[in-house]
């Protein structure tokens, strides 16, 4: 059995103008919603930064929020936690990390309701350092997703790694960067993607693959990609006779998984799951120490200790001045709150 866990990241900056937001909604968010509603077997994990949720509600796009809320309500999607304003978490004070996480929970719970119950965490830009873990764990998240470049051990196909901070553990999933980027840059069609997954399985009875990318890839960055790629993949993976019941509880998949192991059969089917469902399907591996990184970090960047080159490049004087300015702003805001 091959389990495909797909994550889509929905975000627009607070400075985005309403006309551009409307275009993104019409080109991407609504067409994606229609695809998910058409293919009831589709399962995926989604991240909505709270600042985008606010803007959707403020700019008259409540139908999008309602649509994704309904999908979550019937177990087709799950939401993740994150920082509300898309902060680069390793580069901001720890108290601000906690505030951003809390603000995101408050905003998304307000608009998505009880359907917003994140078990996992998406750090913006997949920027990671060990010291962001504790506030994430304390927020109630069971897992975090990181870029594949952060994986310091053998690539996990049939085990799930974990990491820890101050004696508290959290599960770690790694994005398949190569596969995700090939999808994002139209280097694979639906048939090639499915063939790639089957090739990955090899002689293993059960494996999982995690892909993650910007939701705007579908329809906004690449016009019609939600139909020419995603819908075609879903079409191929539909269960023809007896579609799975709501698999949010993962029990059906777990039973099928166990049956395959018992009968010593090699599975050839691909099942779509949320990332959280993988927790019930695969054993835990060793405790690891992921590398500080982002989904834009290269191996050469890591060797140079330049872990976040798009935001804090060691040779970029503009970056240095921006962070100096931000530090001043944070201190001013803190003092203002103390005086209020």
What function would you assign to each model-found segment?
Residues 2-93, 99-100, 117-123, 142-148, ...:
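Short, well-structured secondary-structure segments
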Residues 2-30, 37-39, 160-170, 174-177, ...:
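Active-site and substrate-binding clefts of carbohydrate-active enzymes
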Residues 16-19, 55-60, 91-93, 128-137, ...:
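A short acidic (Asp/Glu
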Residues 29-36, 65-69, 98-108, 133, ...:
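Generic structural signal for well-ordered alpha-helices
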Residues 97-125, 196-212:
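CE4/NodB-like, metal-dependent polysaccharide N-deacetylase domain
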Residues 126, 149, 216:
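Flexible loop residues that form catalytic
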Residues 129-182:
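Surface-exposed loop and adjacent secondary-structure segments within mature catalytic domains
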């Amino acid at each position: 059995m091959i389990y495909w866990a797909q994550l889509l990241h929905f975000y627009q900056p607070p400075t985005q103008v309403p006309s551009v937001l409307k275009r993104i909604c019409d080109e991407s968010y609504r067409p994606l919603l229609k695809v998910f509603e058409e293919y009831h077997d589709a399962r995926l994990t989604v991240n909505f930064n709270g600042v985008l949720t606010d803007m959707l509600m403020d700019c008259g796009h409540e139908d999008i929020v309602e649509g994704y809320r309904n999908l979550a309500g019937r177990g087709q999607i799950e939401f993740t936690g994150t920082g509300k304003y898309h902060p680069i978490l390793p580069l901001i004070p720890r108290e601000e990390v906690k505030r951003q996480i809390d603000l995101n929970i408050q905003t998304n719970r307000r608009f998505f309701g009880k359907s917003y119950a994140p078990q996992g965490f998406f750090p913006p830009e997949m920027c990671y350092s060990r010291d962001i873990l504790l506030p994430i764990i304390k927020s109630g998240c069971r897992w975090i997703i990181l870029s594949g470049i952060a994986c310091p051990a053998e690539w996990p196909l049939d085990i799930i790694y974990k990491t820890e901070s101050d004696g508290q553990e959290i599960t770690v999933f790694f994005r398949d960067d190569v596969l995700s980027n090939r999808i994002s840059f139209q280097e694979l069609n639906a048939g090639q993607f499915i063939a790639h997954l089957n090739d990955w399985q090899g002689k293993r009875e059960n494996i999982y693959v995690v892909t993650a990318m910007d939701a705007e890839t579908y329809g906004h960055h690449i016009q019609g990609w939600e139909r020419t790629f995603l819908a075609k993949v879903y079409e191929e993976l539909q269960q023809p006779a007896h579609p799975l019941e709501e698999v949010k509880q993962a029990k059906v998949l777990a039973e099928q998984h166990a049956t395959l192991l018992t009968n010593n059969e090699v599975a050839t089917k691909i099942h779509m799951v949320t990332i959280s469902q993988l927790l019930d399907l695969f054993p835990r591996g060793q405790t690891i120490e992921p590398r500080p990184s982002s989904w834009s970090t290269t191996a050469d960047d890591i060797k140079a200790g330049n872990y976040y080159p798009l935001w804090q490049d060691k040779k970029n004087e503009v970056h240095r001045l921006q962070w100096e300015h931000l530090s001043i702003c944070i201190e001013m805001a803190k003092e203002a709150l103390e005086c209020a």
